[in-house]
Regions:
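Rieske [2Fe-2S] iron-sulfur-binding domain
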Residues: 71-73
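N-terminal pre-core extensions flanking Radical SAM catalytic domains
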Residues: 1-69, 86
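Radical SAM/AdoMet-radical enzyme domain recognition
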Residues: 75-95, 103-153
């Protein structure tokens, strides 16, 4: 019940975009995915986009190399992937890194595609009031924080 109450208390714009982009388009997108699958057409129901391999942490065991060359995915390539996905009925994206909040054009992606729903996978160390305000204004992004490590996190 508290989940429902929290959902009702959520910013109206965020709630509306969530229902439209995640629930409605998610349902329709999954339906289209099943139709494509029956026809033998392979295209995923949702995509994960790793926008950068740069990170502000050096976690033991992480695939992101702290000594390697920092690379960012070209913004036009990202927009192209998203546009092609929308043509296929897919409006759900996971945004990953490294640490995606390091990616300078991150919010441009969310702004250019208000008809999509994004989950932002972050270590949370760069998340602040400014980021929270931007995400609330955009209303099409849910931040997800990973906490990995031992007791000294």
């Amino acid at each position: 019940m508290s989940l429902f109450l929290n959902f009702i208390k959520t910013d109206r714009r965020c709630r509306s975009k969530f229902i439209t982009n995640m629930v409605l388009k998610g349902f329709l997108g999954f339906r289209k995915f099943k139709q494509r699958k029956k026809r033998g057409e392979l295209f995923p129901a949702f995509q994960f986009i790793s926008v950068t391999n740069d990170c502000n942490l050096k976690c033991q065991g992480c695939w992101v190399s702290s000594n390697g060359q920092k690379e960012n995915l070209d913004i036009e390539k990202i927009h192209s992937v998203i546009e092609e996905s929308k043509k296929q009925g897919s409006y759900f994206f996971g945004i990953l890194g490294g640490e995606p909040l390091i990616y300078k054009q991150l919010f441009d992606i969310f702004e250019k595609h208000p008809d999509c729903y994004f989950q932002l996978f972050s270590n949370g160390t760069l998340f602040n009031q400014s980021v929270a305000r931007k995400l609330r204004k955009l209303a099409n992004v849910t931040p997800l924080f990973s906490f990995e490590g031992d007791e000294q996190v």
